[in-house]
Amino acid sequence: MSAKRVFEKFDKNKDGKLSLDEFREVALAFSPYFTQEDIVKFFEEIDVDGNGELNADEFTSCIEKMLKEVFVFCDVDGDGKIPASESYVTMTSLGKKFTEETSAEKVRAADVDGDGYLNFDEFMALVIGDI
């Protein structure tokens, strides 16, 4: 699932914009650890035009930025890859309720090139695909 598909899924009234309430659902789907304050602050930061709603472009850039920050944090050695063996820790730190076995299965499916690592695109597909 792409960031645009996530946008469409959570745009409940199909008006082409996400309200703060709709965005809250997205944020909590990514991680239940976000506080209300975190969500409001993040929403305000990515609402580039300041109209109190997120359009698809604002949302997509937000998701990519957020996931890039998580990816960089998890990419301890900075080589642009996260070992598949560490995905369980990464996913549970995002609040996902995976067993190690489930995590391994999801990583195998996301590891398109089969190298045993998740690059950013594979990581993004894994995280977004679980929403």
UniProtKB/Swiss-Prot annotation:
Source domain of life: Eukaryota
Boundaries of every EF-hand domain copy: 1-33, 34-69, 70-97, 98-131
Protein's name according to its UniProt entry: Probable calcium-binding protein CML34
The keyword Kinase is assigned to this record: no
Listed PROSITE patterns: EF_HAND_1 (PS00018), EF_HAND_2 (PS50222)
Residues that, per the record, bind Ca(2+) 2: D47, D49, N51, E53, E58
Pfam families: EF-hand_7 (PF13499)
Known role: Potential calcium sensor.
Keywords: Calcium, Metal-binding, Repeat
Gene3D superfamilies given in the database record: EF-hand
TM segment ranges: none
InterPro entries: Centrin_CML-like, EF-hand-dom_pair, EF_Hand_1_Ca_BS, EF_hand_dom
Residues annotated to bind Ca(2+) 3: D111, D113, D115, Y117, E122
Species per Swiss-Prot/TrEMBL record: Arabidopsis thaliana (Mouse-ear cress)
Residues binding Ca(2+) 1: D11, N13, D15, K17, E22
Molecular function via GO: calcium ion binding
Underlying gene: CML34
